[in-house]
């Protein structure tokens, strides 16, 4: 097998429904003749969403008791808050939000922005503790 077809080293992330420490360290990159792919999880119990944030909008400042989230910015730069850290993540950047961490996504741009979200742990939309919310929910 040529070097372009070999998979990069990977450490198993979780066993069963455990929440990983930081899965961004274990994203698998594989090059192929047609291009490449990134593998974020393998055979794990997860919930996967693509979140679209409209220009000038942001999600509530929130935390979760039962899940951690891995975010992958898909297109336009997205404002990120995780804990006390705030920054603008570029397309392709991976962000780990540990269980219990205060976090938020926002779109400072002029076009909709998308983020792939992979939630590890027990997923339930009721497991959202909103600390601030622009929409009074």
What are these regions (language model features)?
Residues 63-65, 73, 107-110:
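Short glycine/proline-enriched turns and hinge-like loops at secondary-structure junctions
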Residues 84-102:
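Short acidic-glycine-tyrosine-enriched beta hairpin
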Residues 17-31, 104-137:
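Double-stranded beta-helix
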Residues 4-5:
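Intrinsic-disorder-associated, low-complexity terminal segments enriched in Asp/Asn/His/Tyr and depleted
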Residues 25-68:
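A short glycine-rich, His/Asp/Glu-containing loop-to-beta-strand
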Residues 66-79, 83:
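Glycine- and acidic-residue-biased ligand/ion/polar-headgroup-sensing regions
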Residues 55-57, 66-67, 85, 101-102, ...:
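A generic "binding-loop/recognition-motif" signal
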């Amino acid at each position: 097998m040529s070097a372009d077809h070999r998979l990069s080293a990977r450490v198993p992330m979780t066993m069963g429904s455990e929440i990983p420490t930081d899965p961004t360290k274990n994203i698998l990159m594989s090059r192929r003749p047609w291009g490449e792919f990134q593998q974020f999880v393998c055979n794990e119990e997860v919930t996967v969403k693509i979140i679209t944030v409209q220009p000038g909008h942001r999600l509530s400042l929130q935390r979760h008791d039962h899940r951690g989230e891995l975010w992958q910015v898909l297109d336009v730069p997205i404002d990120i808050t995780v804990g006390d850290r705030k920054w603008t993540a570029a397309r392709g950047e991976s962000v780990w939000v540990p269980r219990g961490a205060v976090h938020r996504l926002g779109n400072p741009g002029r076009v909709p922005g998308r983020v792939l979200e992979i939630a590890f742990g027990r997923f339930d939309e009721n497991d959202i503790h909103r600390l601030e919310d622009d929409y009074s929910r």
